[in-house]
Amino acid sequence: MKKDRFLIGILVFIAVLVVAAVALFFVRGEEQAYGPEDTPDGVLKNYALAIQNMDYERAYTYLAERDGKPTFETFQQSFLTRQLDTSNSTLQIGEVYESGTNSAWAEVSVIYAGTGLFDTGWSSNDRAILVRQDGAWKITYLPYPYWGWEWYTPTPMPVKP
């Protein structure tokens, strides 16, 4: 009889944990909203969120107008064909440093999800580079998988013998 009460107590405790986990899942399941675009970190957050939401038109607007900018079709295809695959990663934005009034860089970490039960994943630290164009912050560099290696890369000139 005493063992039955103990077992029932354990089962009730487990049931309460399951109900709490399901409730938290549905409460926190709301969609993230875009933030302000007047700061470098706001632009980086909105770019990453647009990529996550597959809103490639919006994400493309955050790219700087410079030589080597990919066409919209190239940009979109990079994500649709999974050349750039952000499905198992997230972008964490750290400190932002403005140098002057027209350029900034931010410390960023790309955090990759683990692939197994005991694999906690890994992260890669890098930086994002932004410039101010026509009063708006635009991105000129982000680490892979949020950026194509060939974007904004100058075309090499052939060496004359």
Give the role of each language-model region.
Residues 2-53:
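Short, low-complexity N-terminal intrinsically disordered segments enriched in polar/charged residues
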Residues 99-161:
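Exposed beta-sheet edge and beta->alpha loop/turn motif
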Residues 42, 46, 56-107, 111-112, ...:
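Short solvent-exposed beta->alpha transition segments
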Residues 1-2, 101:
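Generic cytosolic/nucleocytoplasmic N-terminal low-complexity/intrinsically disordered segments
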Residues 2-4, 71, 142:
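Alpha-helix initiation/capping motif
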